[in-house]
Amino acid sequence: MEENGLFSLGYGNFEEQLNLFSMNKVGGFKTELAMRDGFFYIVNGEAEKILSLNSYGDLLSLFYNEDFYGSGKKSLPSQSSVGKWKKIAYPFALGGAIAADARKYIYTACAIPKERNEQNASGDLLYSQVVLRISSDGSTIDYIGQQGPAGTPFPYISKLYTTENNELVVICKMNDGLCAYWFAENGFLRYKVPVSIKNVPLIASDQGVSDIFVTVENIVPDNYALRLYVKADYYLPSVDAESNVQSGIHYTKSLVYPLNVADGAFGEPLTVPPYEESVTENFSRMQYRLPYNFLGITKNGWLCFIVTTESGFSIEMISDVTRNVVKRHLDIKHQDVLYYTLAFSNDGIISALLADKNEARVVWWRADLLIASLIK
């Protein structure tokens, strides 16, 4: 699939630059990307700001942490661009998942101050994040918790999604799976749907093995219906032939289950063929099977999956209606990329922010055009 370069951003602390390599920050990168209707939203946690840009890279708005930029360490913008800057008055640390809806509302996961963290009743799950919500013109900035506006903090937020009905879906990591919080357009909770490895359907083993291990890799909402798509990866134990002792586990299958949000019932699963690669070494050939990661679902019902390869990314798209499978490859020179983050739009466009040693490039691949040609 052909890559389309859109624009690039330099490194630094000016308004149209990204700070990815801050020396006073520890841990992983805190910069994420979202794209909706041709507009890009980049949360740059290292610089405590959110950029809103068009597809040419023109800065439309910049939302900044008031505490961070008011500390004297960072300067405010020049008078010529001051109208684009909007304050975030909450003491949150930016740098999590980000999404936008059709109204151009921005949602991003934030960490709250440690003294405001909470725990569940059993004390084994930390509630430490909220979702910052910003209206299209920046006039309204508030936050969403488990119950809605100003609610209890979430567990760790792995993904944020918005539907075509402008409803926010928050995916959180739990001790035994994932949990989906489905919010109405006004931000109040409609459904809370925990998906544990204990209630995901098991599969029968053709090897007569009773111990089957399952992980819930991701949950993606339908764009219109009250339906979640739950991707489960299944593993079987590996047994040493000589000692007859379990030596590990190996991947066997991936299934995506439609889950009715209203009654919690699982539907008939869709099989996700694994990524397969052959490696020849010392006159022997090894066949590797890897599970794809669930990237998202389009408005017309195509599920998109992705896995990293040596030469880029392998993409697999499956129609929820016809079950047709389409595979493509995205060419990326990983040796030149220091950091990347991907986004998938409801239209079927795959976007990426690719950071090398000189700049961060924003590109996309028009998978939506491929899907349109298949539907005709």
Please name every model-derived segment:
Residues 1-376:
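Eukaryotic scaffold repeat domains enriched in small/polar residues
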